[in-house]
Amino acid sequence: MSEDEKLPQVIMDPADYEALKKRLDELEKKVENTNAELFQLAGKKVGRDIGILYGLVIGIILSYILPALIKIIQILSLKVLVQQ
C-alpha cells in the first residue's frame, strides 16, 4: 500500500462494536448452514444418479448372465435325471 492511501478509521463504542460482531457472526452461521444444506442436496442428487447408474449396469449384466445360468442349470438337472 502506498503512503498516499490511508486506511479509513472509525471511532465506535465498544458495546456497539461487540453487538455488531455478534450480529455478523450470526449471519455468517446462517450463510454457512445454507451452503451446507445446498451441498448436501447436491450430494444426494449425485448419489441418486450414481445409484441409478449402478442399477442399470447390474441389470444389463444380469440380463446377459441369467439366461445362460438358467440354461446351465437346466442342462445339469437333465444330467441328474438321466443318471438316475
UniProtKB/Swiss-Prot annotation:
Q: Which reaction(s) are listed as its catalytic activity?
A: 5-methyl-5,6,7,8-tetrahydromethanopterin + coenzyme M + 2 Na(+)(in) = 5,6,7,8-tetrahydromethanopterin + methyl-coenzyme M + 2 Na(+)(out)
Enzyme Commission number(s)? 7.2.1.4
Q: Which domain of life is it from?
A: Archaea
Pathway it works in: One-carbon metabolism; methanogenesis from CO(2); methyl-coenzyme M from 5,10-methylene-5,6,7,8-tetrahydromethanopterin: step 2/2
Protein's UniProt keywords contain Cell membrane = yes
Kindly give the membrane topology term recorded for this protein: Single-pass membrane protein
Q: What's one GO BP annotation on this UniProt entry? A: methylation
Just give the chief location class.
membrane
Is Cell membrane one of the keywords?
yes
**Spans traversing the lipid bilayer:** 50-70
Which cysteines in this chain are paired by disulphide bridges? none
Q: What class of enzyme is it?
A: translocase
Give Gene Ontology CC terms: plasma membrane
Give the molecular function GO annotations.
Answer: tetrahydromethanopterin S-methyltransferase activity
Enumerate the subcellular locations listed in this protein's record, separating them with semicolons.
Cell membrane
Name the UniProt key words of this record, in alphabetical order: Cell membrane, Membrane, Methanogenesis, Methyltransferase, One-carbon metabolism, Transferase, Translocase, Transmembrane, Transmembrane helix
Note the InterPro entries from the entry. THM_MeTrfase_su_G (IPR005866)
Question: Subunit info?
Answer: The complex is composed of 8 subunits; MtrA, MtrB, MtrC, MtrD, MtrE, MtrF, MtrG and MtrH.
Q: Quote the function comment for this protein.
A: Part of a complex that catalyzes the formation of methyl-coenzyme M and tetrahydromethanopterin from coenzyme M and methyl-tetrahydromethanopterin. This is an energy-conserving, sodium-ion translocating step.
Family per UniProt?
A: Belongs to the MtrG family.
What name has this protein been given in UniProt?
Answer: Tetrahydromethanopterin S-methyltransferase subunit G
| Biological source species | Methanocaldococcus jannaschii (strain ATCC 43067 / DSM 2661 / JAL-1 / JCM 10045 / NBRC 100440)
